[in-house]
Curated annotation (Swiss-Prot):
Enzyme Commission designation: 2.7.1.130
GO cellular component: plasma membrane
Keyword Nucleotide-binding: yes
Record key words, sorted: ATP-binding, Kinase, Lipid A biosynthesis, Lipid biosynthesis, Lipid metabolism, Nucleotide-binding, Transferase
Gene giving rise to this polypeptide: lpxK
Originating organism: Shigella boydii serotype 18 (strain CDC 3083-94 / BS512)
A single MF term (Gene Ontology): tetraacyldisaccharide 4'-kinase activity
Signal peptide interval: none
Annotated family: Belongs to the LpxK family.
Protein name (database record): Tetraacyldisaccharide 4'-kinase
Pathway where it operates: Glycolipid biosynthesis; lipid IV(A) biosynthesis; lipid IV(A) from (3R)-3-hydroxytetradecanoyl-[acyl-carrier-protein] and UDP-N-acetyl-alpha-D-glucosamine: step 6/6
Classification via HAMAP family: LpxK
Entry's Gene Ontology BP terms: lipid A biosynthetic process; lipopolysaccharide core region biosynthetic process
Length: 328
Protein backbone atom coordinates (compact mmCIF):
# COMPACT_ATOMS: atom_id res chain seq x y z
CA UNK A 1 0.00 0.00 0.00
CA UNK A 2 2.74 2.47 0.93
CA UNK A 3 4.42 1.93 -2.45
CA UNK A 4 1.16 2.79 -4.24
CA UNK A 5 0.71 5.90 -2.11
CA UNK A 6 4.25 7.10 -2.71
CA UNK A 7 4.11 6.39 -6.44
CA UNK A 8 0.87 8.35 -6.78
CA UNK A 9 -1.16 5.30 -7.88
CA UNK A 10 -3.34 5.60 -4.79
CA UNK A 11 -5.17 8.91 -4.11
CA UNK A 12 -4.66 8.41 -0.37
CA UNK A 13 -1.46 10.49 -0.53
CA UNK A 14 -3.62 13.62 -0.59
CA UNK A 15 -4.94 12.82 2.88
CA UNK A 16 -1.38 12.87 4.21
CA UNK A 17 -0.40 16.22 2.70
CA UNK A 18 -0.83 18.24 5.93
CA UNK A 19 1.70 15.99 7.66
CA UNK A 20 4.02 16.25 4.67
CA UNK A 21 3.90 20.05 4.75
CA UNK A 22 4.76 19.91 8.45
CA UNK A 23 7.65 17.52 7.76
CA UNK A 24 8.95 19.77 4.99
CA UNK A 25 8.65 22.88 7.14
CA UNK A 26 10.55 21.35 10.06
CA UNK A 27 13.29 19.74 7.95
CA UNK A 28 13.73 22.91 5.92
CA UNK A 29 13.99 25.02 9.07
CA UNK A 30 16.66 22.70 10.49
CA UNK A 31 18.75 22.90 7.33
CA UNK A 32 18.36 26.69 7.20
CA UNK A 33 19.57 27.02 10.79
CA UNK A 34 22.80 25.22 9.91
CA UNK A 35 23.18 27.15 6.65
CA UNK A 36 22.85 30.48 8.49
CA UNK A 37 25.14 29.16 11.26
CA UNK A 38 22.41 29.61 13.87
CA UNK A 39 23.37 26.04 14.76
CA UNK A 40 26.95 24.85 14.58
CA UNK A 41 27.93 21.61 12.88
CA UNK A 42 30.84 19.65 14.33
CA UNK A 43 33.76 19.33 11.93
CA UNK A 44 35.99 16.28 12.15
CA UNK A 45 39.78 16.63 11.92
CA UNK A 46 39.68 14.38 8.83
CA UNK A 47 37.51 14.67 5.68
CA UNK A 48 33.96 13.31 5.90
CA UNK A 49 32.07 11.81 2.96
CA UNK A 50 28.31 11.34 3.31
CA UNK A 51 26.59 8.64 1.25
CA UNK A 52 22.87 9.21 1.61
CA UNK A 53 19.41 9.29 0.07
CA UNK A 54 16.73 11.84 -0.65
CA UNK A 55 14.05 9.16 -0.28
CA UNK A 56 13.07 6.58 2.28
CA UNK A 57 13.36 2.92 1.32
CA UNK A 58 16.07 0.87 -0.31
CA UNK A 59 18.12 2.59 -2.98
CA UNK A 60 21.32 0.52 -2.96
CA UNK A 61 23.20 2.85 -0.63
CA UNK A 62 25.03 0.21 1.42
CA UNK A 63 26.62 -1.48 -1.64
CA UNK A 64 27.87 1.97 -2.67
CA UNK A 65 29.42 2.48 0.78
CA UNK A 66 31.15 -0.91 0.51
CA UNK A 67 32.37 -0.09 -3.02
CA UNK A 68 33.68 3.29 -1.91
CA UNK A 69 35.53 1.90 1.12
CA UNK A 70 37.08 -0.95 -0.87
CA UNK A 71 38.16 1.36 -3.70
CA UNK A 72 39.82 3.79 -1.30
CA UNK A 73 41.51 0.93 0.57
CA UNK A 74 42.94 -0.34 -2.71
CA UNK A 75 44.49 3.12 -3.15
CA UNK A 76 46.18 2.87 0.23
CA UNK A 77 43.73 5.13 2.08
CA UNK A 78 42.75 4.20 5.63
CA UNK A 79 38.97 4.55 5.90
CA UNK A 80 36.57 4.59 8.84
CA UNK A 81 32.79 4.18 8.58
CA UNK A 82 30.11 5.64 10.84
CA UNK A 83 26.40 4.93 10.96
CA UNK A 84 23.42 5.75 13.09
CA UNK A 85 22.93 2.01 13.53
CA UNK A 86 19.22 1.94 12.76
CA UNK A 87 17.43 -0.58 14.99
CA UNK A 88 20.52 -1.14 17.15
CA UNK A 89 20.25 -1.68 20.89
CA UNK A 90 23.76 -1.32 22.24
CA UNK A 91 24.28 -0.97 25.97
CA UNK A 92 26.02 2.34 25.34
CA UNK A 93 27.03 4.59 22.46
CA UNK A 94 29.21 5.14 20.57
CA UNK A 95 29.80 1.46 19.78
CA UNK A 96 32.96 0.46 17.93
CA UNK A 97 32.31 -2.82 16.12
CA UNK A 98 34.37 -5.95 16.68
CA UNK A 99 34.17 -9.52 15.36
CA UNK A 100 31.75 -10.36 18.18
CA UNK A 101 29.33 -7.48 17.60
CA UNK A 102 25.82 -8.63 16.68
CA UNK A 103 23.24 -7.02 14.44
CA UNK A 104 21.05 -6.55 17.51
CA UNK A 105 23.78 -4.39 19.03
CA UNK A 106 24.87 -2.44 15.95
CA UNK A 107 22.23 -2.85 13.24
CA UNK A 108 22.28 -4.77 9.96
CA UNK A 109 24.22 -2.48 7.64
CA UNK A 110 27.11 -1.65 10.01
CA UNK A 111 27.81 -5.35 10.64
CA UNK A 112 27.63 -6.10 6.91
CA UNK A 113 30.01 -3.23 6.10
CA UNK A 114 32.42 -4.31 8.84
CA UNK A 115 32.46 -7.92 7.64
CA UNK A 116 32.88 -6.95 3.98
CA UNK A 117 35.58 -4.29 4.36
CA UNK A 118 37.33 -4.92 7.69
CA UNK A 119 37.37 -1.14 8.12
CA UNK A 120 36.82 0.44 11.55
CA UNK A 121 33.05 0.93 11.95
CA UNK A 122 31.27 2.79 14.75
CA UNK A 123 27.58 3.46 15.39
CA UNK A 124 25.85 6.17 17.38
CA UNK A 125 22.66 8.24 17.07
CA UNK A 126 25.06 11.19 17.26
CA UNK A 127 27.38 10.54 14.33
CA UNK A 128 30.05 12.94 15.56
CA UNK A 129 30.46 10.72 18.63
CA UNK A 130 30.98 7.73 16.32
CA UNK A 131 33.66 9.64 14.41
CA UNK A 132 35.44 10.54 17.66
CA UNK A 133 35.34 6.88 18.77
CA UNK A 134 36.99 5.71 15.55
CA UNK A 135 39.70 8.35 15.63
CA UNK A 136 40.44 7.64 19.30
CA UNK A 137 41.09 3.96 18.58
CA UNK A 138 42.37 4.34 15.01
CA UNK A 139 44.25 7.65 14.80
CA UNK A 140 45.69 6.60 11.43
CA UNK A 141 42.25 6.83 9.74
CA UNK A 142 42.48 9.40 6.94
CA UNK A 143 38.86 9.74 5.87
CA UNK A 144 35.40 8.97 7.27
CA UNK A 145 32.53 7.59 5.18
CA UNK A 146 29.12 7.94 6.79
CA UNK A 147 26.47 5.40 5.82
CA UNK A 148 23.36 7.55 5.43
CA UNK A 149 23.14 10.86 7.28
CA UNK A 150 22.61 13.30 4.40
CA UNK A 151 20.03 15.03 6.59
CA UNK A 152 22.19 14.81 9.75
CA UNK A 153 23.52 18.36 9.54
CA UNK A 154 25.10 18.23 12.99
CA UNK A 155 28.07 16.56 11.29
CA UNK A 156 29.90 18.78 8.81
CA UNK A 157 30.83 17.09 5.57
CA UNK A 158 33.31 17.68 2.77
CA UNK A 159 31.65 15.57 0.06
CA UNK A 160 28.01 14.56 -0.39
CA UNK A 161 27.02 11.56 -2.53
CA UNK A 162 23.36 10.74 -3.15
CA UNK A 163 22.14 7.32 -4.29
CA UNK A 164 18.75 7.13 -5.98
CA UNK A 165 16.66 4.29 -7.37
CA UNK A 166 16.66 4.86 -11.11
CA UNK A 167 13.35 3.06 -11.59
CA UNK A 168 11.27 4.51 -8.75
CA UNK A 169 13.25 7.77 -8.56
CA UNK A 170 11.20 10.21 -6.41
CA UNK A 171 7.71 8.73 -6.65
CA UNK A 172 5.08 11.46 -6.37
CA UNK A 173 7.74 13.93 -5.22
CA UNK A 174 6.20 14.73 -1.85
CA UNK A 175 7.81 14.76 1.58
CA UNK A 176 7.11 11.98 4.02
CA UNK A 177 4.57 10.57 4.76
CA UNK A 178 2.52 11.46 1.63
CA UNK A 179 5.55 10.67 -0.51
CA UNK A 180 8.99 9.11 -0.13
CA UNK A 181 11.02 12.33 0.06
CA UNK A 182 13.22 13.26 3.00
CA UNK A 183 14.22 16.36 1.03
CA UNK A 184 12.95 17.64 -2.29
CA UNK A 185 14.68 16.76 -5.55
CA UNK A 186 16.16 20.25 -5.83
CA UNK A 187 18.65 19.22 -3.14
CA UNK A 188 20.56 17.31 -5.86
CA UNK A 189 21.86 20.63 -7.20
CA UNK A 190 24.04 21.08 -4.11
CA UNK A 191 25.56 17.58 -3.80
CA UNK A 192 28.86 16.45 -5.28
CA UNK A 193 27.75 13.22 -6.99
CA UNK A 194 24.49 11.48 -7.87
CA UNK A 195 24.63 7.70 -8.34
CA UNK A 196 21.64 6.08 -10.04
CA UNK A 197 20.92 2.44 -9.25
CA UNK A 198 19.27 0.95 -12.34
CA UNK A 199 16.88 2.66 -14.70
CA UNK A 200 18.00 5.28 -17.20
CA UNK A 201 20.45 7.84 -15.79
CA UNK A 202 19.95 11.51 -16.59
CA UNK A 203 22.58 14.07 -17.47
CA UNK A 204 25.29 14.32 -14.82
CA UNK A 205 24.24 11.13 -13.01
CA UNK A 206 26.60 8.18 -12.50
CA UNK A 207 25.06 4.88 -13.72
CA UNK A 208 25.23 1.94 -11.35
CA UNK A 209 23.90 -1.58 -11.22
CA UNK A 210 24.15 -4.33 -8.65
CA UNK A 211 26.19 -7.28 -9.88
CA UNK A 212 25.30 -10.56 -8.15
CA UNK A 213 28.12 -12.91 -7.19
CA UNK A 214 27.99 -16.62 -6.44
CA UNK A 215 25.58 -17.90 -3.82
CA UNK A 216 27.25 -18.58 -0.46
CA UNK A 217 26.17 -21.25 2.02
CA UNK A 218 25.67 -19.73 5.46
CA UNK A 219 26.90 -22.84 7.29
CA UNK A 220 29.88 -23.94 5.21
CA UNK A 221 30.88 -20.94 3.11
CA UNK A 222 30.61 -23.11 -0.01
CA UNK A 223 29.97 -21.12 -3.19
CA UNK A 224 28.04 -22.03 -6.32
CA UNK A 225 26.11 -20.52 -9.18
CA UNK A 226 22.76 -19.54 -7.68
CA UNK A 227 20.99 -21.02 -10.74
CA UNK A 228 22.19 -24.47 -9.60
CA UNK A 229 20.05 -24.28 -6.46
CA UNK A 230 16.69 -26.03 -6.70
CA UNK A 231 13.26 -25.45 -5.16
CA UNK A 232 14.24 -21.98 -4.01
CA UNK A 233 12.39 -19.91 -1.43
CA UNK A 234 13.56 -16.30 -1.66
CA UNK A 235 13.65 -14.09 1.45
CA UNK A 236 14.47 -10.38 1.54
CA UNK A 237 14.37 -8.02 4.51
CA UNK A 238 15.64 -4.91 2.74
CA UNK A 239 14.21 -1.52 1.83
CA UNK A 240 12.83 -2.74 -1.52
CA UNK A 241 12.50 -6.57 -1.57
CA UNK A 242 11.22 -6.78 -5.19
CA UNK A 243 14.68 -5.74 -6.38
CA UNK A 244 16.23 -8.86 -4.83
CA UNK A 245 13.55 -11.13 -6.26
CA UNK A 246 14.10 -9.58 -9.70
CA UNK A 247 17.85 -10.16 -9.35
CA UNK A 248 17.28 -13.86 -8.66
CA UNK A 249 15.09 -14.18 -11.74
CA UNK A 250 17.72 -12.37 -13.80
CA UNK A 251 20.18 -15.06 -12.62
CA UNK A 252 17.89 -17.81 -13.88
CA UNK A 253 16.19 -18.65 -10.58
CA UNK A 254 12.42 -19.01 -10.47
CA UNK A 255 11.57 -19.00 -6.74
CA UNK A 256 8.74 -21.24 -5.60
CA UNK A 257 7.93 -18.57 -3.03
CA UNK A 258 9.07 -14.99 -2.41
CA UNK A 259 8.94 -13.71 1.17
CA UNK A 260 9.32 -9.93 1.61
CA UNK A 261 10.19 -8.85 5.14
CA UNK A 262 10.34 -5.44 6.76
CA UNK A 263 13.66 -3.64 6.54
CA UNK A 264 15.72 -4.20 9.72
CA UNK A 265 13.26 -6.86 10.92
CA UNK A 266 14.71 -9.04 13.67
CA UNK A 267 14.97 -12.72 12.75
CA UNK A 268 15.14 -15.95 14.72
CA UNK A 269 15.59 -19.61 13.83
CA UNK A 270 11.96 -20.60 14.33
CA UNK A 271 10.54 -17.88 12.08
CA UNK A 272 13.08 -18.34 9.29
CA UNK A 273 13.07 -22.14 9.26
CA UNK A 274 9.26 -22.08 9.04
CA UNK A 275 9.56 -20.45 5.61
CA UNK A 276 11.15 -23.56 4.08
CA UNK A 277 9.58 -26.98 3.61
CA UNK A 278 11.45 -30.26 3.22
CA UNK A 279 13.45 -30.32 0.00
CA UNK A 280 13.42 -26.56 -0.44
CA UNK A 281 16.40 -24.18 -0.42
CA UNK A 282 16.34 -20.77 1.23
CA UNK A 283 18.13 -17.93 -0.56
CA UNK A 284 18.36 -14.57 1.20
CA UNK A 285 20.14 -11.24 0.89
CA UNK A 286 23.57 -10.71 2.40
CA UNK A 287 21.99 -8.20 4.76
CA UNK A 288 19.68 -10.94 6.09
CA UNK A 289 22.57 -13.39 6.24
CA UNK A 290 24.44 -11.36 8.85
CA UNK A 291 21.41 -11.82 11.12
CA UNK A 292 20.94 -15.54 10.39
CA UNK A 293 24.48 -16.91 10.29
CA UNK A 294 24.54 -17.87 14.00
CA UNK A 295 21.56 -20.24 13.64
CA UNK A 296 21.71 -21.13 9.94
CA UNK A 297 20.76 -24.53 8.54
CA UNK A 298 22.58 -26.41 5.78
CA UNK A 299 20.10 -25.43 3.07
CA UNK A 300 20.35 -21.67 3.69
CA UNK A 301 22.25 -19.55 1.18
CA UNK A 302 22.72 -15.86 0.48
CA UNK A 303 23.43 -13.97 -2.72
CA UNK A 304 25.97 -11.14 -2.37
CA UNK A 305 25.82 -8.17 -4.71
CA UNK A 306 28.46 -5.61 -5.60
CA UNK A 307 27.96 -2.08 -6.87
CA UNK A 308 29.25 -1.60 -10.42
CA UNK A 309 29.62 2.05 -11.46
CA UNK A 310 30.02 3.04 -15.12
CA UNK A 311 31.59 5.88 -17.05
CA UNK A 312 34.48 8.23 -16.30
CA UNK A 313 32.98 9.94 -13.25
CA UNK A 314 33.68 7.18 -10.67
CA UNK A 315 37.43 7.43 -11.34
CA UNK A 316 37.27 11.22 -11.03
CA UNK A 317 35.36 10.91 -7.76
CA UNK A 318 37.89 8.46 -6.34
CA UNK A 319 40.77 10.71 -7.40
CA UNK A 320 39.10 13.62 -5.62
CA UNK A 321 38.56 11.60 -2.42
CA UNK A 322 42.08 10.14 -2.48
CA UNK A 323 43.54 13.63 -2.81
CA UNK A 324 41.28 14.89 -0.02
CA UNK A 325 42.27 12.04 2.31
CA UNK A 326 45.95 12.52 1.53
CA UNK A 327 45.76 16.21 2.38
CA UNK A 328 46.67 17.35 -1.12
Amino acid sequence: MIEKIWSGESPLWRLLLPLSWLYGLVSGAIRLCYKLKLKRAWRAPVPVVVVGNLTAGGNGKTPVVVWLVEQLQQRGIRVGVVSRGYGSKAESYPLLLSADTTTAQAGDEPVLIYQRTDAPVAVSPVRSDAVKAILAQHPDVQIIVTDDGLQHYRLARDVEIVVIDGVRRFGNGWWLPAGPMRERAGRLKSVDAVIVNGGVPRSGEIPMHLLPGQAVNLRTGTRCDVAQLEHVVAMAGIGHPPRFFATLKMCGVQPEKCVPLADHQSLNHADVSALVSAGQTLVMTEKDAVKCRAFAEENWWYLPVDAQLSGDEPAKLLTQLTSLASGN
